[in-house]
Every structure is written in C-alpha cells, then in structure tokens.
From Swiss-Prot:
UniProt name for this protein: Octanoyltransferase
Additional remarks: In the reaction, the free carboxyl group of octanoic acid is attached via an amide linkage to the epsilon-amino group of a specific lysine residue of lipoyl domains of lipoate-dependent enzymes.
Residues noted as binding substrate in the record, renumbered to the chain: 84-91, 151-153, 164-166
Top-level taxonomy: Bacteria, Pseudomonadati, Pseudomonadota, Gammaproteobacteria, Lysobacterales
Intracellular or extracellular location(s): Cytoplasm
Residues at the site labelled Lowers pKa of active site Cys: 148
Known function: Catalyzes the transfer of endogenously produced octanoic acid from octanoyl-acyl-carrier-protein onto the lipoyl domains of lipoate-dependent enzymes. Lipoyl-ACP can also act as a substrate although octanoyl-ACP is likely to be the physiological substrate.
Reaction(s) this enzyme catalyzes, per UniProt: octanoyl-[ACP] + L-lysyl-[protein] = N(6)-octanoyl-L-lysyl-[protein] + holo-[ACP] + H(+)
Active-site residues, as the UniProt record annotates them: 182 (acyl-thioester intermediate)
Gene: lipB
UniProt organism field: Xylella fastidiosa (strain Temecula1 / ATCC 700964)
Length: 229
C-alpha cells in the first residue's frame, strides 16, 4: 500500500516484543519526515521497530488525497505536501505526535488492524480522564462528540509503516479554522485540556505510549540520540 511498559518502567529486553522509543522533543516537521522515509527505506527484516514522539513547530500537512481548496488561509504557517494518506491537518505546539515505525508484515498486522489499534490506544488513553472517545466509519481518527481530538495518517511501504497519529493535548486550536480539517468543511476540533484532562504533555505521552505498547505487544526501550542524517 503506497498512497515502557504500562507502569513506565524499562523492562528487560526478553520480555515482550522490543521496540525503541525516541523522545525527540520540539522539532520542525520536514527533517523528521525525511528521517522517517530514510529509516523505512534502509530497514531490513532484522531492524528493531521504533516509536518516535515529537511536538512539531506550526505546519499544515497535505496528504496524498488532500486538495489545496481545503487550505483556506494559511497565513504565516507553511503548507507541506507529504506522502501519507489522508487530507490536510495542522501540527503545532501542545500536540502530541507519535510515529510508529513498525514492520507490519513481521507483526502479522494488516493496515485495518493497525489503524484500529492506534485508535483504540487513543480511546483507552482518553478513558483514563473519563473522556469518551469514539471512532467514525470511513473517517479515521478519534472523536469526542462532534469534535476530532486525534488525526491519523499513515503510509505503508514494503510492509513497514511510517507517519502516525497527532493527538491534541493543550494547543492553540485557532489554526484549524484556517483549513477544512481532514477535508471536512466545518469539522470541529478539541483537545484533552478543553475536555477537562491534563495539560502536561509528559503525562499524556506516558499514558498513550503505555496503551500503544499494550495494543501491539511491545516493551518500549528509551534510546538517546538524534536521528542519522
């Protein structure tokens, strides 16, 4: 298709399926995107899966199905055409972005099950703060009532995934008014903070990573260092 365990402790490598965890902090979008591409292009059947966690500088990204007509008034925020599925979305400070770089073939996962697992991890995370997250048929992501709280856009190349999920934690939502989010005119967006949840990115990241590890049977091993150029 082209278009830490739950307690936060570092477990021994032999427990569960190992995956490396990279906490990248605040980063511009394009270098991380290009690094994902390179990682996916050069990995082989023995490569360890990785999850990258990042908070992007302001950017609109337009997926392969995206139309410029859905970008209404970007202003000073750059628009980047990317190789993930889906339409247009916004990334910015206060949004938790997780990129699972997984060998889906090795995991025995189809794309539908993979998407379902990511959505379920977000739904389970929200439930920790008594927020009811839901799926919508034919509209990937997670919604609370009529508002979207997590956008999902992926690509699979040679059976391996890149791109991922963007989860609104405590962010300025105004830039979403400059686009038709995910290609839907008038789609509302919301955040964890606006719904009474925590504003701390570290708190939400720990909860979401634990749920992703549970969904996909991983034990996450934090690793230091930036990405190779």
């Amino acid at each position: 298709m082209d278009a830490v365990n739950a307690c936060g402790a570092v477990a021994p490598w032999h427990v569960g399926r190992a995956a490396l965890l990279r906490m990248l902090g605040a980063q511009p979008y394009v270098p991380v995107w290009h690094a994902m591409q390179r990682f996916t292009d050069v990995r082989d059947a023995t490569a360890v899966d990785e999850l990258w966690v990042v908070e992007h500088e302001p950017v609109f990204t337009l997926g392969q199905a995206g139309k410029l007509e859905h970008v209404l008034a970007p202003g000073e925020i750059p628009v980047v055409h990317v190789d993930r599925g889906g339409q247009v979305t916004y990334h910015g400070p206060g949004q938790l972005v997780v990129y699972p770089l997984l060998d889906l073939s090795r995991l025995g996962l189809g794309v539908r099950d993979y998407v379902y697992g990511i959505e379920q991890a977000v739904i389970n995370t929200l439930a920790q703060w008594n927020i009811l997250g839901e799926r919508r048929e034919h509209a990937p992501g997670v919604y609370v009532g009529d508002a979207k709280i997590a956008a999902l856009g992926i690509r699979v190349r040679r059976g391996c995934s890149f791109h991922g999920v963007a989860f609104n934690v405590a962010m300025d939502l105004e830039p979403f008014h400059r686009i038709h989010p995910c290609g839907y005119r008038g789609l509302q967006v919301t955040s964890v903070l606006d719904l009474g949840g925590p504003s701390e990115m570290d708190t939400v990241a720990a909860a979401l990573l634990a749920e992703l590890a549970r969904q996909f049977g991983f034990v996450l091993h934090p690793t230091s260092g930036w990405l190779s150029s």
